């Protein structure tokens, strides 16, 4: 990568076939999950007219993901990671089929939506952890920043496309189409993943799973990179259906709300060329997080939905910068034998923030207007973020030696 370039270098997709297969599978998977992500809150909102119920579904799914990430972290450090990935994807597809069949019933079951959310949240997180742990083996640690940015770009571009498609499907065909296409896409991802080489974990002594997990906790707590970053602001999506009523948005326009954050994040990934050369990544990560919280606070105050979309896109861009820096610092400083557990714990931190935020925002939405709920969450997190900036001294002062630019990077 040219040292002076802000643009992302995509050469890994050409030089590493296994990473290219993961890229393709992840893109298809994210598009499929995006269709699901639009359908579930809209269906629950239509059935219950309650933001609290929408928040509960996100919280339950987040809780299942937390457990799955804990289990998946241990499994990824003990067992062949390719098998874990394939198992997780296949079982998720079964859950999506269940959601589709439930939506086709004359009176869909709300309980079934909650239970299938638990199922999909648990098994999806198993695959996420194993994929993250296998990344360094697929591309080499020297390429982790580049791989992380490409991965983020894959996720965000898929997340931009799928909500808009999902919104159009909701307006024309109903939620069953979203669920059915999500299931089909999930099973299609198995095809490129089957071409992956075996991904065995590094040799290490066998120990009790809980003891193994505690070892990961101890390492993470001893790391100066424990940022304590809160991601609750991204849980504002539980208010989208209610805010759509406030802004008098159509079903198709709701999709733009869901697409705004990943669009901003995609721009952040595309312009991440210089992030690897940041001398103080910890400080940059904290400042970008503060900016993202401010964007969420302003989001709910916008008089028109299009201005709200701009605020969400800004949040996505700043969040992308923060997430990419945190990802790279953790991956490069974590021993290979602990990558599964550390990635599981790190991702669980984000999922926990989203789940707690969804529950709080759902409750606020029941007591306050959606506009007030969104603004209160953003400005509240901004205050907490300023305190974190002052308290997390080691992270704020953390310095790294910028990587040397090689001929292959130019």
Swiss-Prot record:
InterPro entries: Enterobactin_exp_EntS, MFS, MFS_dom, MFS_trans_sf
Localization in the cell: Cell inner membrane
Superkingdom of origin organism: Bacteria
Cytoplasmic compartment segments: 1-21, 77-83, 131-156, 200-218, 272-281, 331-350, 394-410
GO molecular function: enterobactin transmembrane transporter activity
The keyword Nuclease belongs to this UniProt entry's keyword annotation: no
Predominant location: membrane
Periplasmic side: 43-55, 105-109, 178, 234-250, 302-307, 372
Record's keyword terms, sorted: Cell inner membrane, Cell membrane, Membrane, Transmembrane, Transmembrane helix, Transport
Record field: transmembrane: 22-42, 56-76, 84-104, 110-130, 157-177, 179-199, 219-233, 251-271, 282-301, 308-330, 351-371, 373-393
UniProt-listed PROSITE patterns: MFS
Pfam families reported in the protein's UniProt record: MFS_1
Gene3D superfamilies for the chain: MFS general substrate transporter like domains
GO terms under cellular component: plasma membrane
Membrane topology value: Multi-pass membrane protein
Family under the similarity heading: Belongs to the major facilitator superfamily. EntS (TC 2.A.1.38) family.
HAMAP family (alphabetical): MFS_EntS
Function: Component of an export pathway for enterobactin.
NCBIfam families assigned: PRK10489.1
Protein name (database record): Enterobactin exporter EntS
Gene: entS
């Amino acid at each position: 990568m040219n040292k002076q370039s802000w643009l992302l270098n995509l050469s890994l997709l050409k030089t590493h076939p296994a990473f290219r297969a993961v890229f393709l599978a992840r893109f298809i998977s994210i598009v499929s999950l995006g269709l699901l992500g639009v359908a579930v809150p809209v269906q629950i909102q239509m059935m219950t007219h309650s933001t609290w119920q929408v928040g509960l579904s996100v919280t339950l799914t987040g809780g299942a993901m937390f457990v799955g990430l804990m289990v998946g972290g241990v499994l990824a450090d003990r067992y062949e990671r390719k098998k874990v990935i394939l198992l997780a994807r296949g079982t998720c597809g079964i859950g999506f089929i269940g959601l589709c069949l439930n939506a086709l019933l004359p009176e869909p079951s709300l309980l079934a939506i909650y239970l299938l959310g638990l199922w999909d949240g648990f098994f999806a997180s198993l695959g996420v952890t194993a994929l993250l742990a296998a990344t360094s083996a697929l591309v080499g640690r020297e390429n982790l920043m580049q791989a992380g940015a490409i991965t983020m770009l894959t996720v965000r571009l898929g997340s931009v496309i799928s909500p808009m498609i999902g919104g159009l499907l909701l307006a024309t065909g109903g939620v069953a189409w979203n669920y059915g296409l999500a299931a089909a896409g999930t099973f299609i991802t198995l095809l490129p993943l089957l071409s992956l080489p075996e991904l065995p974990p590094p040799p290490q002594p066998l120990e009790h799973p809980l003891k193994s997990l505690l070892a990961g906790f101890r390492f993470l707590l001893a790391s100066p990179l424990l940022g304590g970053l809160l991601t609750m602001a991204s849980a504002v999506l539980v208010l989208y259906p209610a805010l759509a009523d406030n802004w008098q948005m159509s079903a198709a326009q709701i999709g733009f709300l869901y697409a705004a954050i990943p669009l901003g994040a995609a721009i952040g990934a595309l312009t991440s060329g210089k992030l690897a050369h940041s001398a103080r990544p910890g400080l940059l990560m904290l400042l970008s997080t503060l900016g993202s919280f401010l964007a969420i606070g302003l989001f709910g105050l916008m008089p028109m939905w299009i201005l709200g979309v701009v605020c969400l896109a800004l949040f996505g861009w700043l969040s992308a910068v923060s997430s990419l820096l945190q990802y790279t610092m953790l991956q490069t400083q974590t021993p290979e034998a602990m990558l599964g557990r550390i990635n599981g714990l790190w991702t669980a931190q984000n999922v926990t923030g989203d789940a707690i935020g969804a529950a709080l925002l759902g409750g606020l939405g029941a007591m306050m207007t959606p506009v007030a709920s969104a603004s209160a969450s953003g400005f509240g997190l901004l205050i907490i973020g300023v305190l974190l900036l002052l308290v997390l001294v080691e992270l704020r002062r953390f310095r790294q030696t910028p990587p040397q630019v090689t001929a292959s990077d130019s």
